[in-house]
């Protein structure tokens, strides 16, 4: 039952978003700015998540061996 409730909730959110998009041309400037900020924030989070995942996967899945690091020893004072 939890799965059907979740699907119903997602469908409800999608319908409200579609209704909001359809009413956007008649919206007030404040609503346009608020909606634009929300969309911009959501897109930014998704893009940053995609970049983080791609960087993580590139380092984890990459089979190339990195160059061996040589430790640096301090020099003796003269």
From Swiss-Prot:
The keyword Cytoplasm does not apply. The chain crosses the membrane at residues 32-52. Signal peptide: none annotated. InterPro entries: SMIM5 (IPR047133), SMIM5/18/22 (IPR031671). It is found in: Membrane. It is a single-pass membrane protein. This is Small integral membrane protein 5. GO terms for cellular component: membrane. Keywords: Membrane, Transmembrane, Transmembrane helix. Its main location: membrane.
């Amino acid at each position: 039952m939890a799965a059907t409730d979740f699907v119903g909730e997602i469908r409800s959110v999608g319908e409200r978003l579609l209704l909001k998009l359809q009413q956007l041309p008649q919206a007030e400037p404040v609503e346009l700015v608020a909606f634009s900020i929300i969309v911009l924030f959501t897109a930014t989070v998704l893009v940053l998540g995609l970049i983080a995942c791609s960087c993580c996967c590139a380092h984890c899945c990459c089979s190339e061996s990195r160059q061996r690091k040589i430790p640096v020893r301090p020099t003796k004072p003269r």
